Amino acid sequence: MRPRALPALAAFTLLAACGAQADPNWRVIDPENLMVIETSKGRIIVELRPDLAPQAVARMKQLTRAGLYNGLQFHRVIDGFVAQTGNPGNKDGGKSDLSNLPAEFTAKLPRTDYHAAVTRSDGSAGFLGTLPVETTSEAEDRRRNEGTTQFWGAYCPGVVGMGRDDAFDSANSEFFFMRGAARRLDRLYTVVGMTVDGIEH
């Protein structure tokens, strides 16, 4: 596996943006928040979400640019659940030399880029860009009167999260791709992004 941040994919993004101008529903992804992972099965492209998990996304970019992920295997693959990588020792439970990260299970954000698909009395479900998310209710937002909504990633197929030990504040370098829905992980693991291409790999 060889992940890389995408200065090289800027040309791809520019070409995509040219086609996007004809379609008002097209959304161009910031190349700074794209991660390309080359595997023996094909290319995987992930849109990282620093608005939801700024420290975890910064760590993934740092480790990618440092080459830590180059040549690593997916050391934990469970059909219908996850495919996990990012351990420098190619086994479960390893870490980089950097300190562990704090949990970033939820984020307070404005509703500007949010598209609700389902609204309930206790919250809503929808998308932040390509990422499936859940939120607190608008009534709760008004009660808090902060001008923001509490968001958290919904662990659906293609969502990318940070691996960790039993302690909530133990994410470090490992990350995983959801291969099926596991909503029991919501608000227990930091969501860092969404697979936008190559989910079949």
Residue ranges and their predicted role:
Residues 1-2:
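N-terminal secretory signal peptides that target proteins for export/translocation
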Residues 7-16:
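Bacterial N-terminal signal peptides
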Residues 6-7, 38:
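Intrinsically disordered, low-complexity Ser/Thr/Pro-rich tracts
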Residues 18-201:
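Cyclophilin-like peptidyl-prolyl cis-trans isomerases
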